[in-house]
């Protein structure tokens, strides 16, 4: 299965609680942290919800 690199580029402070949970669900902890996640519909949904805080490659 394909993977996607996701990087947190903006702070989670003051964001919508559900968007914070999506970022945590992707495994991101701090600004500049990058993780590789499987390209599944579930992960795509979390990425799409919090897109304004993330950089996605691949």
UniProtKB/Swiss-Prot annotation:
One of its GO terms (cellular component) is cytosolic large ribosomal subunit. One of its GO terms (biological process) is translation. One of its GO terms (molecular function) is structural constituent of ribosome. It comes from the Bacteria. Keywords: Ribonucleoprotein, Ribosomal protein. PANTHER family: LARGE RIBOSOMAL SUBUNIT PROTEIN UL30M (PTHR15892:SF2), MITOCHONDRIAL RIBOSOMAL PROTEIN L30 (PTHR15892). Belongs to the universal ribosomal protein uL30 family. NCBIfam families: rpmD_bact. Part of the 50S ribosomal subunit. This is Large ribosomal subunit protein uL30.
């Amino acid at each position: 299965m394909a993977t996607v690199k996701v990087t947190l580029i903006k702070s989670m402070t003051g964001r919508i609680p559900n968007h914070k949970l999506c970022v945590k669900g992707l495994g991101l902890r701090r600004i500049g942290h990058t993780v590789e996640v499987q390209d599944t519909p579930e992960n795509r949904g979390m990425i799409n919800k919090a897109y304004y805080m993330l950089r996605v490659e691949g």
